[in-house]
Amino acid sequence: MFKAVWSIGRDRFDRIEALRRAAGACPQCISDGKDAYAGHVYVCEETGEPIAAGRMYPDGDALIIDRIAVMPQYDAMPYAEFVLRMLLFKAQELPQNDIRIICDESRFALVRRFGFAQSGAHTFTCSRNAIVWDSECRH
């Protein structure tokens, strides 16, 4: 079994930072100033072993979702999709209509399945009301 935990800002951020580092995030992607006001989702085993994490933060009239990280031993499982679904679900409660996802190429297909269109080298955009929720969970 696993559990998912929401946090805001740097509350319990040390484990998210450690997960990003262990998942192979580039040094400048471990932590930045946006983490202080972002919403974070953290997924772990019941034992506390980290599995995946992601964050979401406001940027003007849009919400940004980025830093989706999955531990290498869990990457073949659909935890990246689970994290993205949780972030998108929470986005439905927020006032921003546009959602932008910033990700690396390994997540492009996943993001497209939710109806996001590429709008930059590593950026995808979709309005909150146009999200495709019936994408299949695939490994």
What role is predicted for each listed range?
Residues 36-37, 50:
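Short, basic and Ser/Thr-rich N-terminal targeting/leader segments
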